């Protein structure tokens, strides 16, 4: 049958989607990045968002035969909360965990040390995918090198730097409509007998592989290759909106960016539509918030128009009639160099001399994200980067970049933005499990920072993938991770 064919894939940096094939979470995402129940069926939270009662799906087993139940969840909660393991993403997401209590075989109550209204969305993040208790007992190396979950596919082998192979789990609970509560997550004939994932960094090599038939699924497709692949009768190209947003950070604790008029001038000086055409080859959209439109509690605002004359007026009002010189730090990839040069050209039109300082990631991270000093003493003036709100909730797209407590080296507030009102709103958004109230709070945060401009929200990408034209059911989620629950090969 069609799904028994072995498939090979070229991937770049999409481990979250691959992990989701082998392991399910308590919650997950549908194709539109909306949260859906997976190994949980439902939950209740107290008003203070400090206690969450999770009801578990029955009739599920791990691929090693271990049953999925309350004991299995508690083993995973204990693992997430164990900071001695050094699981940076997991411990950051779950650093409010206190303990978990077994109510019955399929009910667990999780107690938090403080209010955390975004807890359920964090349980949909790849960092909280569920691992077999047997594998957890075997140690962290075993978990990292041979994951065992309840997923649609089972781990087979991993050769560092070369490939990872998985095979179909025909007993996956997602095929069973009764276990799923009425509607199966995947059709009975969906899936491939095995999949080999090959990380391929060079875009041209990935494109050649899909055209030659050496790979049957490829992501992500570089925008400059879209037309080429669309013109290939053996290849199908898919496209969807991304929740990732590209930013231009400005250090608000250093002159001249400690003046909001200067930051506003920067916003008017950059032509976002031109950015999409020049940098993204037309495959993008102008950002209207710090978070993508599919993110829970997104609130859009009108983009700043391209108005270089207004930018010059604002610079004059701020005391910089002749502009100024500043430095942009960024990872020196080909794509980032193109972005940096675009910004340099745009800002030169209003008298701002943007010196470019691209560097290797390790050096950049040490200088910027690893800086352990006050913002006024930090080396960074401006910084080029982006963010994907991978929990699907506005908290994760705002707090790491805006909270005073998120300044380096703690997190990603590279603008060194300090606003007591915003700090309190971010705390308020976590202090309740009422999603309507959280929506109001995060709308106010987004409106406030749109005026304060600690960073410029430039554009969002399109997620682009390609497959052999006899394969269907492949897609990319808004966070860029691969989705293949109903993927299959057409009958031959």
What are these regions (language model features)?
Residues 41-86, 103, 109, 256:
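Aromatic- and charge-enriched surface segment that lines or borders ligand/interaction sites
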Residues 34, 124-196, 204, 309, ...:
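Gly/Pro-rich hinge or "lid" segments in bacterial periplasmic/extracellular proteins
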Residues 465-492:
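Long beta-strand-rich cores associated with HINT superfamily self-processing modules
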Residues 353-366, 378, 396-468, 491-492:
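Extracytoplasmic/peripheral linker and loop segments enriched in polar/acidic and small residues
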Residues 55, 91-135, 151-159:
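Surface-exposed binding/hinge segments that line
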Residues 5-8, 12-47, 78, 148:
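N-terminal lobe/hinge region of extracytoplasmic solute-binding protein
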Residues 153, 285-317, 335-338:
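Structural transition elements
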Residues 228, 253-294, 338-339, 449-457:
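Periplasmic-binding protein-like
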């Amino acid at each position: 049958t069609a799904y028994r064919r072995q498939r090979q894939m070229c991937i770049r940096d999409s481990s979250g989607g691959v992990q989701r094939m082998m392991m399910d979470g308590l919650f997950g995402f549908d194709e539109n990045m909306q949260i859906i129940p997976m190994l949980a069926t439902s939950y209740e939270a107290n008003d203070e968002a400090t206690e969450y009662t999770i009801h578990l799906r029955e009739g599920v087993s791990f691929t090693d035969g271990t049953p999925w139940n309350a004991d299995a969840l508690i083993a995973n909660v204990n693992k997430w909360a164990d900071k001695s393991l050094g699981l940076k993403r997991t411990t950051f997401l779950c650093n409010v965990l206190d303990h978990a209590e077994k109510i019955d075989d399929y009910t667990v109550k999780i107690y938090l040390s403080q209010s955390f209204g975004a807890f359920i969305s964090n349980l949909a993040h790849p960092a909280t995918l569920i691992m077999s208790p047997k594998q957890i007992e075997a140690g962290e190396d075993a978990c990292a090198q041979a994951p065992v979950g309840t997923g649609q596919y089972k781990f087979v082998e991993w050769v560092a730097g070369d490939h990872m192979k998985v095979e179909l789990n025909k007993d996956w609970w997602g095929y069973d409509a009764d276990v799923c509560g009425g509607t199966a997550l995947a059709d009975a004939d969906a899936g491939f007998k095995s999949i080999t994932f090959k990380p391929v960094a060079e875009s041209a090599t990935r494109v050649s592989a899909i055209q030659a038939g050496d790979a049957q699924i490829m992501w992500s497709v570089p925008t400059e290759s879209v037309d080429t692949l669309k013109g290939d009768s053996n290849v199908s190209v898919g496209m969807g909106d991304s929740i990732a947003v590209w930013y231009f950070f400005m250090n608000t604790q250093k002159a001249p960016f400690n003046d909001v008029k200067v930051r506003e001038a920067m916003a008017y000086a950059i032509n976002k539509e031109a950015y999409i055409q020049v940098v993204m080859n037309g495959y993008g959209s102008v950002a209207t918030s710090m978070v993508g439109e599919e993110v829970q509690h997104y609130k859009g605002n009108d983009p700043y128009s391209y108005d270089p004359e207004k930018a010059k007026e604002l610079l004059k009002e701020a005391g910089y009639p002749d502009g100024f010189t500043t430095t942009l730090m960024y990872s020196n990839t080909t794509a980032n160099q193109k972005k940096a040069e675009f910004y340099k050209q745009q800002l030169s039109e209003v008298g701002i001399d943007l010196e470019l300082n691209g560097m290797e990631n390790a050096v950049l991270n040490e200088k910027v994200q690893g800086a352990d000093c006050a913002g006024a003493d930090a080396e960074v003036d401006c910084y080029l980067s982006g963010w994907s709100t991978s929990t699907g909730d506005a908290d994760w797209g705002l707090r790491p970049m805006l909270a005073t407590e998120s300044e380096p080296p703690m997190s990603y507030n590279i603008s060194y933005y300090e606003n007591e009102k915003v700090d309190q709103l971010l705390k308020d958004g976590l202090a309740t499990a009422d999603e309507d109230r959280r929506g109001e709070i995060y709308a106010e945060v987004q409106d406030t920072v749109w005026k304060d401009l600690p960073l410029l929200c430039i554009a969002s990408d399109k997620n682009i993938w390609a497959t052999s034209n006899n394969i269907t059911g492949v897609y990319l989620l808004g966070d860029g991770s691969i989705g293949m629950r109903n993927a299959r090969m057409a009958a031959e």
